[in-house]
Amino acid sequence: MESANIFGSDEDCRSCESGWTMYLASQSHDRDDDCYYGDDDEEEEDSDGGDSMDSDASSGPMEATSYLKLAQEIEEQNSIKKKKKKTNEEMVLVETTRVHNNINHDDDDDDDEDDGDNHDYDDGNDSYSVVHSYVGSVRQKGLV
C-alpha cells in the first residue's frame, strides 16, 4: 500500500480522536474527508477484505492462559530453583577434635604410687584444645 493511500497521519487529520479505530482508505473508496470513522450514518457493506483494521483486543493471548502451566513445567522450575539454592548455600563440614594436652607442673617424675599401673589419670592439670577443621567453601556475607 502506498503511503499516499494511508490517511489519518498527524499531518493529514488532526481531528481524529485517539482510541477510535481509524480506517485505511483504499483507492476504490476515495472520500473527500482525509479520515473517517466506522460510525457513519450511511450503510456500508461489512466485508472481511475491506479497509477496516482488526481490533487489538482479540489479537493477544488471554491473561488466564499465560498463568497456566503444565505439571512438568512446574517440576522443572522447582528443580532449577533447588539447584541454584544448593550452589549458593555454604557447604561447610565442621569436624571437632579434642586434643589432650597433658601439663605436668612437676618436672620431677615422682611416682607416689608405683604399682605398675601406667594409666594417665586426670590430676586436674590437663587441658584440652578444640580443633575445628573446615571443608568446603565458606561464603562471606555481602560479597555475593
Swiss-Prot record:
Stretch list, region Disordered: 27-130
Cell membrane as UniProt keyword: yes
Tissue-by-tissue expression: Expressed in vegetative tissues (hydathodes and trichomes of leaves, shoot meristems and roots) as well as in floral tissues (pistil tips, developing anthers and sepal vasculature) with higher levels in young and developing tissues than in mature ones. Expressed in seedlings, leaves, flowers and siliques, but not in roots.
Disulphide bridges: none
Residue window of motif SOFL-B: 52-61
Top-level division of the source organism's lineage: Eukaryota
GO-annotated biological processes: cytokinin biosynthetic process; cytokinin metabolic process; cytokinin-activated signaling pathway
Ranges of Acidic residues composition bias in the record: 35-54, 106-117
Topological category with respect to the lipid bilayer: Peripheral membrane protein
Coiled coil segments of this chain: none
Localisation per UniProt entry: Cytoplasm; Cell membrane; Nucleus
One cellular component term from this protein's GO annotations in UniProt: plasma membrane
Main location class: cytoplasm
Motif stretch (SOFL-A): 18-23
Family to which the UniProt record says this protein belongs: Belongs to the SOFL plant protein family.
Function per UniProt: Involved in cytokinin-mediated development. Promotes the expression of cytokinin synthases (e.g. IPT3 and IPT7), thus triggering the accumulation of trans-zeatin riboside, trans-zeatin riboside monophosphate and isopentenyladenine 9-glucoside.
Comment block on domains: Domains SOFL-A and SOFL-B are required for function in cytokinin-mediated development.
Protein name per Swiss-Prot or TrEMBL: Protein SUPPRESSOR OF PHYTOCHROME B 5
Organism name: Arabidopsis thaliana (Mouse-ear cress)
